[in-house]
Design a protein with these regions (language model features):
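Short amphipathic alpha-helical patches
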Residues: 53, 74-82, 212-216
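Ser/Thr-glycine-rich phosphate-binding loops at phosphate-binding pockets of nucleotides
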Residues: 27-35, 205-208
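Active-site glycine/GP-rich loop and adjacent strand/helix microenvironment
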Residues: 12, 100-252
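Conserved AMP-binding loop of ANL adenylate-forming enzymes
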Residues: 61-105, 117, 121
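Active-site diphosphate/adenylate-binding microenvironment
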Residues: 1-27, 37-41, 45, 49-50, ...
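Residue-level signal for alpha-helical context at structural boundaries
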Residues: 47-48, 72, 76, 160, ...
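Short, charged low-complexity intrinsically disordered segments located at boundaries
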Residues: 2-6, 79-93, 162, 182-187, ...
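Short, well-ordered alpha-helical packing segments
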Residues: 7, 27, 51-62, 75-76, ...
Length: 252
């Protein structure tokens, strides 16, 4: 297996094995439901790829005709703990923690909820801390999987007895989502909004940044090419896929 032959030795600190030099960071990915965590190598080149792709997606905001007040707001990322585990030969943890560690000092003042709250592992406690801080922030973009972000906004609205999240964050104009299909959450999202906001889908995983939605009025994502990821495509037919849509062993 690839792990036993190659990846295991990279994790133990061996150089020039699966990638040139020594791989310092590994993202912990649960993979399929119920399976043990996998360590996904995160090279310095991958980190730069994530950063470049994020900037590319943010650069499309100018097409949304946003008010000037939006451009001095913060980005609130709702996710798992960013606390990293320092091992003898490497550092591992959630991808968000690895990327947080490499956030430019220029961007740090515009990101929320900050290092202390981001590092909290207890989800309920983290929500309580964000709810407490919410009135002090001017959030223009919220990012994260729908269930987490909507739950947070619902708790803020309920805690402060608001009509909508826009009563506390009037400059909230964009929601960047991913991880799951958004459509089942639209009705619930609309209940906490005071007005429509731009929705942008993204396909970001521990294995790489694969694509993002370029226009709010058009569904579908742009595949990110020339971005450090090798894509190989095969025809979607019965020769290559079984009746459940799973790739066959000898597909070509």
């Amino acid at each position: 297996a690839f792990y036993e032959k190659w990846l295991k030795y990279s994790i133990l600190g061996e150089k020039d094995n699966t990638w040139r030099g020594r791989i310092k960071y590994y993202a912990l990915s649960s993979g399929t439901t119920g399976s043990p965590s996998k360590r996904i190598p995160v090279t310095s080149e991958m980190i730069r790829s994530f950063q470049k792709s994020s900037l590319k997606q943010l650069s499309i905001l100018h097409s949304l005709d946003l008010p000037q007040s939006f451009y001095s707001t913060s980005i609130l990322t709702v996710g798992g703990s960013t606390k990293l585990n320092y091992k003898e030969t490497h550092v591992e943890g959630d991808l968000s923690g690895i990327l947080k560690k490499h956030t430019s000092f220029i961007a740090t003042p515009f990101t929320r909820p900050g290092a202390r709250i981001s590092g909290v592992k207890d989800w309920s406690k983290k929500l309580d801390l964000i709810v407490e801080k919410a009135p002090k922030w001017d959030v223009g973009i919220i990012a994260g999987i729908p269930s987490w972000c909507i739950m947070l906004m619902e708790r803020i609205v309920a805690h402060y007895n608001l009509d909508s999240i826009h009563d506390i964050w009037p400059n909230l104009y964009v929601y960047v989502h991913g991880g799951v299909f958004m459509d089942p959450y639209i009705q619930r999202l609309n209940l906490v909004l005071g007005r429509p906001i731009g929705l942008l889908d993204t396909y970001l995983a521990s294995e790489g940044y694969f694509g993002y939605q370029e226009k709010t009025e058009q569904k579908g994502m742009r595949l990110l090419l020339n971005n450090g990821i090798f894509f190989e495509f095969i025809p979607f037919n019965t020769d290559n896929f079984d009746e459940n849509g799973v790739v066959k062993k000898n597909a070509s």
